[in-house]
């Protein structure tokens, strides 16, 4: 089984890559990220690409599943930037999944997509996903849910799985989460519980490289390449 993961060097993406790389039923993991990485888990190829710009169909071709984790929580004060990354990027991923004939699409939405409930009671997955009108991130995720509704209607042969998690934290990404949520409000070192995801290793993206295979570069186990090749940009 060949699985492609967008946002593969992110907080969640690195854990997914690590898990799939250890799964005997998975023959190849293709990690897609805007920046490369020195991390080289088994059976993993890295492709440097921006989902909002680059041509994704060649990357998704022959994949058994695409797991779409790429997105941006910040900058909330620049809604056009988050719209580009979360909405336009997701739309291009969905289109490429359809064009490449991928049978399974897993999309990471957010608990923020759910509509508020006045009485504060718990809800299940059938609850409307119209978001809180004043929450910028939730509005974006809600819009993508509507796009995905249309995708499911038009591509009945594709199995679509939607994830709506809350915040996901792990020890190795402490420093990156500190920068994301509190920035300069928390002094450096106060939350230093693990390595920065900006380096190498699980949850630590950096720069990459490897043996070339077509338009991508694969990372053989134990190698330490310098830079992954970018995919061709659509003109």
What is each model feature region?
Residues 1-25:
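N-terminal Rossmann NAD(P)H-binding glycine-rich loop of SDR-like oxidoreductase domains
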Residues 38, 44, 48-88, 96:
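NAD(P)H-binding glycine-rich loop region in Rossmannoid oxidoreductase-like domains
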Residues 88, 92-137:
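Conserved Rossmann-fold NAD(P)-dependent oxidoreductase catalytic core, especially the SDR/UDP-sugar
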Residues 134-161:
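Active-site Tyr-X1-5-Lys
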Residues 151-209:
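NAD(P)-dependent short-chain dehydrogenase/reductase
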Residues 214-235:
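Mid/C-terminal beta-alpha module of Rossmann-like enzyme folds, strongest
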């Amino acid at each position: 089984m060949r699985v492609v993961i967008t946002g593969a060097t992110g907080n969640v993406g690195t854990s997914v890559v690590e898990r799939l790389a250890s799964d005997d039923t998975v023959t190849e993991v293709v990690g897609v990220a805007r920046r490369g990485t020195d991390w080289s888990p088994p059976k993993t190829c890295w492709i440097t690409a921006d989902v909002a710009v680059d041509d994704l169909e060649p990357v998704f071709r022959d994949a058994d599943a695409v797991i779409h984790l790429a997105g941006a929580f910040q900058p909330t004060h620049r809604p056009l930037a988050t719209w580009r990354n979360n909405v336009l990027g997701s739309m291009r991923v969905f289109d490429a999944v359809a064009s490449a004939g991928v049978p399974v699409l897993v999309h990471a939405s957010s608990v923020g997509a759910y509509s508020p409930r006045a009485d504060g009671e718990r809800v299940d997955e059938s609850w409307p996903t119209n978001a809180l009108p004043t929450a910028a991130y939730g509005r974006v995720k809600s819009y993508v849910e509507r796009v995905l509704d249309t995708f499911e209607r038009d591509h009945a042969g594709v199995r679509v799985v939607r994830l709506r998690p809350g915040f996901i934290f792990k020890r190795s990404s402490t420093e990156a989460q500190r920068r994301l949520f509190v920035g300069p409000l928390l002094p450096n070192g106060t939350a230093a519980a693990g390595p920065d995801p900006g380096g190498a290793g699980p949850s630590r993206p950096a720069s990459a490289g490897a043996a070339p295979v077509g338009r991508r570069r694969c990372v053989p186990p134990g190698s330490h390449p310098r830079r992954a090749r970018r995919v061709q940009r659509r003109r």
